[in-house]
Amino acid sequence: MRLSRYFMPILKENPKEAEIVSHRLMLRAGMIRQQSQGIYSWLPLGKRVLDKVNAIIREEQNRAGAIELSMPTLQSAELWQESGRYDAYGKEMLRIKDRQDRPMLYGPTNEEMVTDIFRSSVKSYKDLPLNLYHIQLKFRDEIRPRFGTMRSREFMMKDAYSFDLTREGAEHSYNKMFAAYLRTFERLGLRAIPMRADTGPIGGNLSHEFIILADTGESEVFCHKDFVGFDIPGENTDFDSVEGLKAIFDKWTSLYAATSEMHDEAAFNAVPEGDRLSARGIEVGHIFYFGTKYSEPMGAKVQGPDGKEHFVHMGSYGIGPTRLVPAIIEASHDDNGIIWPASVAPFDVVVINMKVGDQACDDTCELIYAALKKAGKDVLYDDTDDRAGTKFATADLIGVPVQIIAGPRAVANGEVEVKDRKTGARETMTIEAAINRFVA
């Protein structure tokens, strides 16, 4: 992508409305723009990051055996009345009526709808276990939306829903998502700690929040410091192994970890003082097991091996991609801007032409740009006529992991400079070596 033809409206000054680092940097880097309170447009740079986050989420959901579908954003109020949540959910749910005066709602979550899909299609235990997920925009009318897309009214959510014949089967499905979430966050460059959580309006009796530690987090968290060094389940994790996944779950829940809502001061004080960690954190995922809370009132049942009908046991599992993006920034930035993990960076490399119009610089940059694109890399080519300082500031602000800098003096010697955004380390190398480093 040539920067001269790209839409990336950079802000030079810090926006007054931004209270936290991620909101400020997302606005300055031209990733998002606010349309109304708590509602944002994702501009091209932000959309590229969001798409890469979603791709990793999809890969790990699929790896764990979940199956993707797509459900509508507008839902019938009748389904929510059937489950008993229509009146109980509160003012966060946006209620509307269509032209036939039928009550509808803009879905804040999808337990009722996915249960309706299940009950109309699945009749036998032989079709279980089943886990369905989708990635969709949702709306909750927050009283006080703040911090940009960290806590917005319209947001994107990956929500998965599992169906099992027994509680034991449902707990295995829960453990699958537990392990999948640990893998997902690690691939996004985050260390998330699972903490026992309140079930809230979703309901149920087993729930964990996944929290990353950050000074700007809304939650106060208390945990054993060893969580920071725990090994993440590997790519070869057997998601069909009941014992293997139970071992992962037991390991990650064996030490004390709780948000302020579930904090037990006495239990935390029992942790050796040198091992206690109290900090602030950001919730990036939430999983629930709620048994037959929805299947019973909505009649979601299957015929079991005994020939009798059984209400299915359910769980739900949420990750907010539009919340994850600012969370990654909160965890990875410096005074100059964002430092993206390579897995979600909008571009792999930015090629900076220090003197546009100089034939040697132009030819060198075109050569590198073409070679990296041919190798399948996402490349941003700064071919603008901005001053050198502006080019460097822009590259640092948007956080591309690698900068390849071509100036007249270096190019005359057949060389370019390569800068690592995270460490700031610079290395001069031949043009061929620079290309080979990133196409190998």
From Swiss-Prot:
Which gene is the coding source of this polypeptide chain? proS
Alphabetical GO CC annotations of the entry are: cytosol
- Major localization class: cytoplasm
Family assignment?
Belongs to the class-II aminoacyl-tRNA synthetase family. ProS type 2 subfamily.
Q: Does the keyword Membrane apply?
A: no
**Keyword Cytoplasm tagged:** yes
Q: Which reaction does it catalyse?
A: tRNA(Pro) + L-proline + ATP = L-prolyl-tRNA(Pro) + AMP + diphosphate
Identify which top EC class this enzyme belongs to: ligase
Please identify the protein, giving its name as recorded: Proline--tRNA ligase
Q: What does this protein do?
A: Catalyzes the attachment of proline to tRNA(Pro) in a two-step reaction: proline is first activated by ATP to form Pro-AMP and then transferred to the acceptor end of tRNA(Pro).
Task: Please name every pair of cysteines joined by a disulfide bond in this record.
Answer: none
Q: What Gene Ontology molecular function terms does this protein carry?
A: ATP binding; proline-tRNA ligase activity
Q: Which NCBIfam families match?
A: PRK12325.1 (NF008979), proS_fam_II (TIGR00409)
Gene3D superfamilies named in the record? Anticodon-binding domain (3.40.50.800), Bira Bifunctional Protein, Domain 2 (3.30.930.10)
Q: Entry's PANTHER family? A: MITOCHONDRIAL RIBOSOME PROTEIN L39/PROLYL-TRNA LIGASE FAMILY MEMBER (PTHR42753), PROLINE--TRNA LIGASE (PTHR42753:SF2)
- Compartmental location: Cytoplasm
**Per UniProt, which keywords does this protein have?**
Aminoacyl-tRNA synthetase, ATP-binding, Cytoplasm, Ligase, Nucleotide-binding, Protein biosynthesis
What species is given as this protein's source?
Rhizobium etli (strain ATCC 51251 / DSM 11541 / JCM 21823 / NBRC 15573 / CFN 42)
Q: What do we know about how this protein assembles, alone or with others? A: Homodimer.
Q: Which residues form a coiled coil?
A: none
Give the record's GO biological process terms.
prolyl-tRNA aminoacylation
Signal peptide positions (record): none
